Amino acid sequence: GDYRRQSRGRSCIRRYVFGSVSGLTRKDVPGFIKKHYAFSSIVYDIPDYNARYYAIMRLSIEQDVTMLVTANPSTIVEMQHNAIEYFDKYVEDIENGTLNKDLNIPEYIREELEKDLKPNPKRAAELRRLKEEYYTPLPRHYWPNLQVLSTWKCGNTKVYLDKFKGRSEEHT
């Protein structure tokens, strides 16, 4: 969804993606804010780690994400690894409006996530074009309007931030 607000006289639109720890606090925010996230917080209830991250990227890569928030930068690296490994599957799911049936996702969660999925052949074609052009599409390619990346930058988390260098327009 979109989050619209006034900021110094300008209208701002944001799409949010949150990591797993951030997902816990995200569940407690008011409903009028929740509706503007890239996906339902029920995704964090998926017990299978690989299925959870697949779902996070599947639901996010389809959208024009402008803000990514996660406590631990390892989440960003994991999202990118998933995008590389499953890119073609994401494109297929987006084109068909599906969520990979091979994933170990409890049925009640799958039903909740799939209820809003619709075939999106236009976005699937855009993603295919990105893969043809860049071979390995990066966040700066599929989320060109990503403006904010909020994460920890202390201690050993710097190791993960270094892995993200060059994958976004700027790294600070």
Question: Each PLM stretch: what is its role?
Answer:
Residues G1-S168:
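Active-site phosphate/ATP/adenylate-binding loop shared across adenylate-forming ligases
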